[in-house]
């Protein structure tokens, strides 16, 4: 099917257009009538939630100002078809960053991005804005304090997502100027806000299971969290700068930009504010990252073995432990100077809006059955911890070569107890209580 575009219409494409930040970008573009918008995503058809159906997006689809096209970025033919008639492409599609599957990440973030670039050139797209990530400069060991864009890619990245996003970003920057195509890359730091399907829901799930009491590391690490409306505003600023021509365009094109709220905050303070705003307790129990790392490796190994058989993507992974315990703040001066970017929503206002948008997840709305199961889960796990730690200390106190095997086993048991407490992995039924675990 050939996309029908009239000469007077200005079209843009948003890849991954049904993702968290992408939905907000689509709505902003429609609300301010900047472009007609074509949403490109994997699903065969767009399914609107009730809010979207009755809101500006639903109206725009019915009026023809927004189109939906099913496109897999790994299929160049589909990408070319989806980009026909477009003046601008916002390339926001990427797999979930928590999935440490190199083949998947590479196929989308590198091969898919190559197809996006080639399709842009083939159909005559003028401007390409790529949603990158600050993780492209993270090696998994060294934190970043007020880092700017002069920080190079590390020899080795924290995970497959970061490594392949860096490769994709490099391809976008290298493509600047090819056949008149102008490009730049946006690196938004730790996006949050209404519509988030990962951070807040995961936080609440952990809180309801009694697992949000833990601080990984010493709790002093700073982060740059960025409200989603500021992220989409940065994308619009980038597009406008590339479209300006002259010196503004020359300075903006072919560059990468860190985007933040410009208000660094302690990571665990931010999480605590979200939890308290939703009626849950602040995390208070500190666990050294060095203790969590071997457990995280066990979790990741288990997922690699059991993932094909239905095991859910784990929350606790080695890359996640590193991210939770290090500093990650960035300097957005370059975006301010070259793109004209500055946050439009302050951090505390963003936190308030986020809490308000998740009112249905507040503690007082927790189902009674879920509360009961949580209490039972805590009892079961506490008993396991007490028994296993007692065994550990008894066996560790034993000296002599004859106790080496027992000591090793006891250490494994201790690690297992902590693993169960963090992840809620218990036998389906405990004989003492006879109740099912929480999924």
Curated annotation (Swiss-Prot):
GO molecular-function term, one example from the UniProt record: 3-beta-hydroxysteroid dehydrogenase (NAD+)/C4-decarboxylase activity
Keyword Glycosyltransferase: no
A GO CC term attached to the entry: membrane
Mutagenesis / variant outcome for changing residue 135 to A: Normal activity, but slower catalysis with 4alpha-carboxysterol as substrate
Record-listed E.C. numbers: 1.1.1.418
General function of this protein: 3beta-hydroxysteroid-dehydrogenase/decarboxylase involved in sterol synthesis. Catalyzes the formation of 3-oxosteroids from 3beta-hydroxysteroids-4alpha-carboxylate. Involved in the regulation of inflorescence internodes and leaves growth, probably by affecting auxin transporter activity possibly by altering sterol composition in the membranes.
Pfam families: 3Beta_HSD
Keywords recorded for this protein, A-Z: Endoplasmic reticulum, Glycoprotein, Lipid biosynthesis, Lipid metabolism, Membrane, NAD, Oxidoreductase, Steroid biosynthesis, Steroid metabolism, Sterol biosynthesis, Sterol metabolism, Transmembrane, Transmembrane helix
Family: Belongs to the 3-beta-HSD family.
Entry coiled-coil feature ranges: none
Carbohydrate-modified residues: 75, 158, 327
Protein name per Swiss-Prot or TrEMBL: 3beta-hydroxysteroid-dehydrogenase/decarboxylase isoform 1
Top-rank lineage group of the source organism: Eukaryota
Location within or outside the cell: Endoplasmic reticulum membrane
Outcome recorded upon mutating residue 135 to T: Altered activity due to reduced affinity and catalysis and leading to lower amount of C4-demethylated sterols and higher quantities of 4,4-dimethylated sterol intermediates, and a higher ratio of 4,4-dimethylsterols to 4alpha-methylsterols
Active site annotation, chain numbering: 165
Main location: endoplasmic reticulum
Bilayer topology: Multi-pass membrane protein
TM segment ranges: 381-401, 405-425
Pathway: Steroid biosynthesis; zymosterol biosynthesis; zymosterol from lanosterol: step 4/6
Top class in the EC scheme: oxidoreductase
Disruption phenotype: No noticeable phenotype.
Record site: Essential for the 3betaHSD/D activity: 41, 72, 131, 161, 165, 328
Catalytic activity, reaction form: a 3beta-hydroxysteroid-4alpha-carboxylate + NAD(+) = a 3-oxosteroid + CO2 + NADH; 4alpha-carboxy-4beta,14alpha-dimethyl-9beta,19-cyclo-5alpha-ergost-24(24(1))-en-3beta-ol + NAD(+) = cycloeucalenone + CO2 + NADH
Domain Reticulon intervals: 371-439
GO biological process terms on file: auxin transport; plant organ development; regulation of transporter activity; sterol biosynthetic process
């Amino acid at each position: 099917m050939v996309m029908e575009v009239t000469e007077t219409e200005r079209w843009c494409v948003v890849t991954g257009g049904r993702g968290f930040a992408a939905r907000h970008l689509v709505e902003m573009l429609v609300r301010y009538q900047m472009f007609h918008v074509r949403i490109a995503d994997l699903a065969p058809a767009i399914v609107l939630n009730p809010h979207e159906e009755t809101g500006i997006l639903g109206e725009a689809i019915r009026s023809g100002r927004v189109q939906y096209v099913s496109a897999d970025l790994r299929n160049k033919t589909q990408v070319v078809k989806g980009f026909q008639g477009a003046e601008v492409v916002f390339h926001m599609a990427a797999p979930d960053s928590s999935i440490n599957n190199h083949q998947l990440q590479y196929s989308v973030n590198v091969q898919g991005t190559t197809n996006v670039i080639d399709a842009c050139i083939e159909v005559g797209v003028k401007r390409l804005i790529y949603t990158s990530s600050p993780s492209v400069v993270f090696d998994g060991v060294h934190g970043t304090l007020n880092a700017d864009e002069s920080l190079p890619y590390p020899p080795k990245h924290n995970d497959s997502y970061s490594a392949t996003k860096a490769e994709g970003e490099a391809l976008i920057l290298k493509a600047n100027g090819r056949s008149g195509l102008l490009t730049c890359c946006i690196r938004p730091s730790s996006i949050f806000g209404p519509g988030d399907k990962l951070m807040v829901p995961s936080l609440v799930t952990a809180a309801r299971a009694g697992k949000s009491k833990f601080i990984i590391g010493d709790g002093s690490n700073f982060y740059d969290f960025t409200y989603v409306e500021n992220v989409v505003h940065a994308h619009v600023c980038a597009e406008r700068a590339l479209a300006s021509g002259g010196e503004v365009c020359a300075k903006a094109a072919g560059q990468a930009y860190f985007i933040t709220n410009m208000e660094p905050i302690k990571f665990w303070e931010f999480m605590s504010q979200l939890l308290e705003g939703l009626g849950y307790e602040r995390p208070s129990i500190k666990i050294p990252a060095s203790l969590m790392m071997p457990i995280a490796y066990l979790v990741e190994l288990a997922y690699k073995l059991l993932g094909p058989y239905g095991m859910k993507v784990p929350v606790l992974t080695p890359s996640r432990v590193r991210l939770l315990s290090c500093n990650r703040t960035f300097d957005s001066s370059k975006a301010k100077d070259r793109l004209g970017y500055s946050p439009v929503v302050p951090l505390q206002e963003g936190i308030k809006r986020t809490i308000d948008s998740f009112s249905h997840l507040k503690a007082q709305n927790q189902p009674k059955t879920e509360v009961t199961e949580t209490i039972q889960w805590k009892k079961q796990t506490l008993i396991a911890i007490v028994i296993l730690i007692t065994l550990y200390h008894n066996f560790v106190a034993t000296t002599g070569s004859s106790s080496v095997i027992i000591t090793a086993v006891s250490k494994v048991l201790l690690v297992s107890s902590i693993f169960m407490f963090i992840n809620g992995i218990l036998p389906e039924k405990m004989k003492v209580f006879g109740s099912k675990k929480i999924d």
